[in-house]
Amino acid sequence: MSKDLNPEKALIFRIVHRDNIEPMLVDGCHCRATMKGVKYTEIGNPELIQKRTDKAVPIDPGGTLSDYVPFYFTPYSPMLYNIKTGYNGIKQRPMRDIAILVSSLHRLAKLKVPFVFTDRHAYLKLAQFSDDLADLNWIIWPTLQARDFTKDDIDKFEKYQAEALVYRHVPIAALLGIVCYDEGAMAEIEAAAAKAGAKVKVKAERRWFL
């Protein structure tokens, strides 16, 4: 997988709780701003999730970070590490309860799904935003390939968490696949996809889960 993290493929990855998979297979992924009152199992930092509602996106289509569905450019993220270990006060969860959605910026562009991306964690003041695929050289691809998110260099740590932000909604057609922890989880997701009539590849890949 590490070699596949490059600008030519521009793969993007979203970590979700498996409880959210079934409705997502029916209607895709919606941004937080449009999901008020909808049952959804959050897995990130609750304080940061709330703060993102006030962080403006400085380029079109605008809005705030909560108007976007966030992805990373790697499945091996600090967020997943925190969920796995319970680090920094994040609720610890078994990896079998987690699924990773896979898409790509090229796929989104082909489907004309609006998106922007950043050079580092989108909430940070220094974050740069772009919707131009020519700016994918902002992403520190060799560091992502090395799975190096140690905090020996803060700039590196921030840039490791660069985000792809999909405006409002990610349709099922934009997904290249769903990766889960084991064969049992894969069977359950495949059954849910069949029930929803969603044509999406499902794969068990334990190595993705750190």
Model-derived regions: residue spans:
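Active-site-proximal loop/hinge segments that shape catalytic or ion-binding/gating pockets
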Residues: 1-73, 77-210
